[in-house]
């Protein structure tokens, strides 16, 4: 690791600790004695979302957050609940072992999480996500919820 003070390539690790999503390493330059900290993180592959029209765009977790905030409006769903839901969805996506995922799959993951969180938020999200054509489709969803 190059020393930020003298640019020497010779340094040694004097301490390693687990940080949130990285390994924190305390280093000492063997040339000038300067102490510095580095972080080692896993490089995650960028996720691409395959839209209904087959276009691909980078995964944007904020889109999920916005959709959930809209669906949870005036509901007893905290911002922490929303953040946890999004984190769970992103974890499920990354477990697919692919750097491309269809938007439908993301929507289904969100629906699975919302079904456990709040029924009204689930219905609101589903009504937009599934684009119900008539009331009978909504009634079918409601029947499935009341069976729980």
UniProtKB/Swiss-Prot annotation:
Keyword DNA-binding among UniProt keywords: yes
Biological process terms in GO annotation: negative regulation of DNA-templated transcription
Transmembrane segments: none
Keywords attached to this entry: ATP-binding, DNA-binding, Metal-binding, Nucleotide-binding, Repressor, Transcription, Transcription regulation, Zinc, Zinc-finger
Cofactor(s) needed by this chain: Zn(2+)
Zn-finger (unnamed) residues: 3-32
Function field: Negatively regulates transcription of bacterial ribonucleotide reductase nrd genes and operons by binding to NrdR-boxes.
Name of the protein this chain belongs to: Transcriptional repressor NrdR
Gene: nrdR
């Amino acid at each position: 690791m190059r020393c930020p003070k003298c640019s020497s390539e010779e340094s040694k690790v004097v301490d390693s600790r687990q940080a949130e999503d990285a390994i924190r390493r305390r280093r000492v330059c063997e040339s000038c004695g300067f102490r510095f900290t580095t972080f080692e993180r896993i490089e995650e592959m960028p996720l691409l979302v395959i839209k209904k029209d087959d276009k691909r765009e980078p995964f944007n977790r904020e889109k999920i957050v916005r959709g959930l905030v809209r669906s949870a409006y005036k509901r007893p769903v905290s911002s922490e609940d929303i953040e946890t839901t999004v984190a769970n969805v992103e974890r499920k996506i990354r477990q697919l072992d692919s750097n491309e995922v269809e938007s439908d799959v993301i929507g289904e993951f969100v629906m699975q999480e919302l079904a456990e969180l709040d029924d009204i938020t689930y219905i609101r999200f589903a009504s937009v996500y599934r684009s119900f054509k008539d009331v009978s489709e909504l009634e079918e969803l409601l029947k499935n919820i009341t069976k729980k």
